[in-house]
Amino acid sequence: MFTGQEYHSVDSNSNKQKDNNKRGIDDTSKILNNKIPHSVSDTSAAATTTSTMNNSALSRSLDPTDINYSTNMAGVVDQIHDYTTSNRNSLTPQYSIAAGNVNSHDRVVKPSANSNYQQAAYLRQQQQQDQRQQSPSMKTEEESQLYGDILMNSGVVQDMHQNLATHTNLSQLSSTRKSAPNDSTTAPTNASNIANTASVNKQMYFMNMNMNNNPHALNDPSILETLSPFFQPFGVDVAHLPMTNPPIFQSSLPGCDEPIRRRRISISNGQISQLGEDIETLENLHNTQPPPMPNFHNYNGLSQTRNVSNKPVFNQAVPVSSIPQYNAKKVINPTKDSALGDQSVIYSKSQQRNFVNAPSKNTPAESISDLEGMTTFAPTTGGENRGKSALRESHSNPSFTPKSQGSHLNLAANTQGNPIPGTTAWKRARLLERNRIAASKCRQRKKVAQLQLQKEFNEIKDENRILLKKLNYYEKLISKFKKFSKIHLREHEKLNKDSDNNVNGTNSSNKNESMTVDSLKIIEELLMIDSDVTEVDKDTGKIIAIKHEPYSQRFGSDTDDDDIDLKPVEGGKDPDNQSLPNSEKIK
C-alpha cells in the first residue's frame, strides 16, 4: 500500500529530508509533465486517462510540506496504475503488465512498461532506500506518525485532544508495524488500498482503546520514577501491576509517622499488652532524649592544690603580660637557658614524686606523663625569662599531645562511673536503662488499672446503696398496703356482720373473719412464690430468707400447682425450704 505519507513523517529540520523533499518535487513534476505513451487504437483510453488526471486529483496541492500531500500523491499514482491495469490487454506488449496472479500484491512491472509508472516505482524505491539509511529511532517516529495520520484521515480518532499511539505503544505490535511499510513496495488497486487501510485502522483502534482506556495502566514515566524507590528492593515492575487501594503488595518503607516495630517485647515484665498497641518504641524514646552534658574538669582547682603543696619551693606567679605569643621573636641566652632547663627538670621530678605518692593507685602511666607535661605551666620564680623558657619547653614537649589529652579526658570520665560507648559495660548499662523505663511504664499502667478498678467499685457500691434504699421503701410500702387492705376488709366484714346478725347469729361473723385471714395469707404466699422468698416476718412483713435455685430446677418436680398446700405452717416457715443449704439470711 503506497500512501506517500513518509514524506510528511520525516523531520523537516534534517538536511537529508530537505534533499528528499526537493527530489520528490522534481520527480512529481516529471510525472505530471510527461505524457503517457499509447497506441493509436487506444486513443479513447488515453484521452480518458488524461481527462481523469486533469480532475480534482491535480487541482489539489502537491507540495510535500502540505499535510494532504500524501493523500493527493496517492490519488495520482493510483490513477496511473488503474489505467495500466485496466487496459493492459489493449496496450502494446511493451506497455503491458505481466498478469501472473489476480492479487495486486503479486503483480510485477516489467522494465518495458509505462515510463511514467516506472518513474513512480523508481520514486518509491528511492524513498525506501532513504528510510533504510535513517536511524532506528527516526524510523520508529516515522512509523508512529504514519499510523497517526492513517487514524486521523480515516476518522477513527474523532477527538483531537485524545492521545494517539506513540512509538512505545507501537513497538508492542511488530506485525502491524511491518505490514504497512511492506505494502508500499507494490502498486495495489483502490480496492486493496481500502482493505489494507481498514485493517490497519481496526488494529490501531483496538490498540489505542487498550492503551488509553485502561484505568489501571501506568504509562506516565513520572509516576514510574516516583514509585520506583518503593518497589526497587523487590524487583517489582509497577507498570505491570494495577494500582489498588490498599496495595496488593507490601511496601519496603514504613508509612507516615509509623514507628518501625523492631523492639522485642518482654512478656515476663508486664509488656504482653504492648504486642498489639501502636506505642512509641524504646528506641525512639532513647534517641529523642537530650545528650548528657560533658564532665566538668576543674583544672584551676588542680593547679591550686599543686601550688599549695609546693608553696615553700615556688612562691611567685608568672604575670599574664609575660606569656609570649607564638609569632614573637625569640631571644636566646645560652647561660640562662641551661640554668632554667636544670630547674625545670628538678621541678618535673618533684611533681612526679608528689603525684606517685598520691593515693590514686589505679591511674595509668599515660596520665602521669600527661601531668608531667602540664606541670611546665606551673608558676616559677626567676622573672619573665624563666616563664618564657618554661612555656617553650611545654610547647616542645612531645609527651603532651592531643592524643594524650583525649586519653586523659576518657580517664576522667571513667573514674566518674560513665562507661565508654561501644563496650560491654556500656551495652549492659543501656539495657538496664531500657528495663528501668519499661518497668516504670508497667508500674504506671498497673496504677492506672488499679485506679480504674477502684472507680468502678465505688460506682457499684453507690448503686447497691440506692437499690437497698429502694428495697426498703418497697417493703414498707407493701406492709402499708397490707395493713390498709386488712382495715378495708375489716370494715367490709363489719358491714356484712351487721347484716348477717339479724339472720344467722354469731357463727356467721366468725366464718367471715376466718375467710379474711385466709385471703390475706393466700395473697402473701403467691407473692413469695413469685419472688422465691422462703421466709417473711409476720409482724413487719420483711423478707428473712431467699431461695437460691437455678431456674431450670424450679419447676423440675412432678407435683402439680393445684396440689400445693397454701396453708401456713407453724412458725411461719415452709418445711420444704428449711433444709436448703443455699438459703441466705437477710438481716
Swiss-Prot record:
Annotated GO CC locations: cytosol; nucleus
Span list, region Disordered:
1-62, 123-144, 169-195, 381-423, 552-587
Q: What else is known?
A: Present with 1240 molecules/cell in log phase SD medium.
Q: Which family does it belong to?
A: Belongs to the bZIP family.
Start-end of Polar residues biased regions? 396-418, 577-587
Q: What is this protein called?
A: ATF/CREB activator 2
- Keywords on record: DNA-binding, Nucleus, Phosphoprotein, Repressor, Transcription, Transcription regulation
The species this protein belongs to is Saccharomyces cerevisiae (strain ATCC 204508 / S288c)
